[in-house]
Curated annotation (Swiss-Prot):
One of its GO terms (cellular component) is extracellular region. InterPro entries: Invert_lysozyme, Lysozyme-like_dom_sf. The keyword Isomerase does not apply. This is Lysozyme. Has bacteriolytic activity. May play a role in digestion and in the host defense mechanisms against invading microbes. Gene3D superfamilies: 1.10.530.10. Residues 21-134 form the I-type lysozyme domain. The keyword Secreted applies. One of its GO terms (biological process) is killing of cells of another organism. Pfam families: Destabilase (PF05497).
Amino acid sequence: MSAVLVLALVLLSLTCVTDAISDACLTCICKQESYGCTQIGCRMDGRSLSCGYFQIKKSYWIDCGRLGSSWEACADDYNCAVRCVRAYMKKYIGKSGCTANCKNYARLHNGGPKGCTKPSTLTYWNAVKNQGCSINS
């Protein structure tokens, strides 16, 4: 019986690992958001401010767990921003009803917690694809 339990835990852990956003997909999103994945600071995006490599909004930063010393500091620190994006994706991919792939991660990043279901985020996905990613990246 314990061998079955161990096998189940191993399979579950593999599922969790494979559902994580890949480095390749993160890079494509970063390139799209900050003109080649560069530190660009904060900019107005519609009616709200977006900051850093991934153009993270304050509400996104709160949802990712308030990493770093502040929203702007985390967004402008590549490693902190990556941790924030990974945490956000982990939090919402399972709740969104969408499968874990680069297309849906990009759409979540652009459109919020249910972004992968919004037709308006398909244009963003096409822009991310143009940065060199595919659905399976």
